[in-house]
Amino acid sequence: MSSLFAQRISMDASPAPSALFNRIEASFLRQGLMQHLGARLVRVEPGLCEVALPYSERVNQQQGGFHGGAMGALADIAGGYAAMTQLADELEVTTVEYKINFLAGFKGGELRAVGRVLRAGKRIIVTTADVVHLDANGKTSACALMQQTLAPVPKTY
């Protein structure tokens, strides 16, 4: 596995949630799609967000593997929330565009997307997300790479 994907993937063993985690989680829980798919917020740090998506019939495609749309949505969310960690509480982000490269398909286990901020400007924020597959034994395998551009927008709730 490349060093890009060999970086730390959280195993859900973290201390009490921070104020930053709680702020991001409040927005994440409003995401109907993420709730429908069964995704969960795993880790939030300044400039970083990790989201998990367990395998289920809600996220598979006709051949039984994870659907590319589910992978893309997971990467979009991880990158978007990584960007949001760089903003004031009254702001959120909206995706302007993203490009994703699918590296391999997987069945079972769970996907983890780790979004990272590359540049946080006043008008645009550029992020990346690495998507990896975790099998039942905890082995990670590269799944997808995403690059994204986002725009800060006022929070509307």
Label each region the model flagged.
Residues 1-52:
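Non-catalytic linker/capping segments at the edges of enzyme domains
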Residues 3-18, 87, 105-108, 112-114, ...:
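HotDog/MaoC-like acyl-thioester-processing domains
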Residues 33, 45-47, 92-94, 109, ...:
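Residue-level preference for beta-strand/loop junctions
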Residues 55-56, 60-74:
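A conserved, well-ordered hydrophobic junction motif at loop->secondary-structure transitions
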Residues 59, 81, 152-154:
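Feature marks short, surface-exposed loop/turn motifs that line or immediately flank catalytic pockets
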Residues 69-89:
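Active-site helix/loop of acyl-thioester processing domains in fatty-acid/polyketide metabolism
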